[in-house]
A protein has these predicted regions:
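A short, Lys/Arg-rich alpha-helix, primarily the initiator
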Residues: 1-18
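Residues within the helices of the helix-turn-helix
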Residues: 13, 24, 54
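The alpha-helix within a helix-turn-helix
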Residues: 16, 27, 57
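Flexible coil/turn residues that form the inter-helical turn or adjacent wing/linker of helix-turn-helix
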Residues: 19, 49
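Short alpha-helical DNA-recognition segment
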Residues: 21-40
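DNA major-groove recognition helix of helix-turn-helix
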Residues: 41, 68
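The DNA-recognition helices of helix-turn-helix-type DNA-binding domains
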Residues: 44
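DNA major-groove recognition helix of helix-turn-helix/homeodomain DNA-binding modules
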Residues: 51-66
Length: 70
C-alpha cells in the first residue's frame, strides 16, 4: 500500500468519524456504494478515481488536499 493510499484511507476514516457518520451514511451522501467506501477506507482500492475522492470530500465537507495530507 502506497503512502498516498494509506493517508487517504486514514483521513477519510478520521473525517467520517469526526462527523459522527457511518460508512453507510457517507456512501449515501457521496452517491457511492457502501462497498466502494469500505474498500477505499481499508486501502484495498489502490488508485481511486479523482471524481470518487472529490465526491467523498464534498460529503465530508473537506477538500481533496485534506484527505491526501500525510
Amino acid at each position: 500500500m502506497s503512502k498516498t493510499t494509506l493517508s487517504l484511507a486514514r483521513n477519510i476514516k478520521k473525517y467520517r468519524r469526526k462527523s459522527a457518520m457511518s460508512q453507510d451514511k457517507l456512501s449515501k451522501r457521496a452517491g457511492l456504494t457502501l462497498h466502494t467506501i469500505a474498500k477505499i477506507e481499508s486501502g484495498a482500492t489502490l488508485d481511486p478515481r479523482v471524481e470518487t475522492v472529490k465526491r467523498i470530500a464534498d460529503a465530508l465537507d473537506c477538500t481533496i488536499d485534506e484527505l491526501l495530507v500525510t
